[in-house]
Amino acid sequence: MSPELDTDPSAFPSAPPASLDDPEVIVEHDWRAFQRVERMADHWDRPGWSDRQRKYYWMHTFPDPGQLLQRTEHCQRALQHLGMDPVPADGLHVTLLRVGAVDQVSTAQVEHLLDLTQELPVSAFHVLAHPLAGSRGAVRFSLTPWKPLVRLHAALHAAGKQAGVPGGAPTTAFRPHLGIAYSNQERSAPAVIDAVEPLRSLPPVPLHFTTVDLVELRRQDRTYRWRTIRSVPLPSSATSRTALA
């Protein structure tokens, strides 16, 4: 059973969708939340981050993004006039969970965490990346379904608690997404929303989650860069091999 998601004002959207399985419900929910944004913030103006800091995160990365990259670059070209910071080809990722600042997590804790995640109770799975919606600080793809991503987040969060790392937001506040461009200034949101809307008719792109990556994350030149500590394989299953239409 997947953990329940709660309304959380620090999350976006603050309330979860009515269904964690139904793509139409999730995509529409993301879009309606973005339509209600009046002002977008500078994504890089964030307390607790500087170019000198390093933090451990669980992410899903895309060494060979293929069709995802084609769809991303198509959308980025259509939004180029907005002057946002596009996510580069080698920077595409799905953020799953913060582990903690490098200076707050010992090498022994990292090794313990990796040992605990060698047999996660989550099988490999497929999701779809749907163009296009956004948040208060970014333009991003909606991901569907949420349920396997929520289960993965919960498993990683449980492992982190067992390893005694600082950890990140609880699973109840998790909102899966895939960012493709960051707002680099405060701006009126309606112009961004209007530019995004025509891209919503593009078909979704299938993504295959067969690994989860523990990375050392940093900010560099208004983008995110990372060093992969280890890619942890997710066990295969008959269900995970079922292709999504």
Question: What is each PLM-predicted segment?
Answer:
Residues 2-245:
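Histidine-dependent nucleotide/RNA phosphoesterase domain, centered on the 2H-phosphoesterase fold
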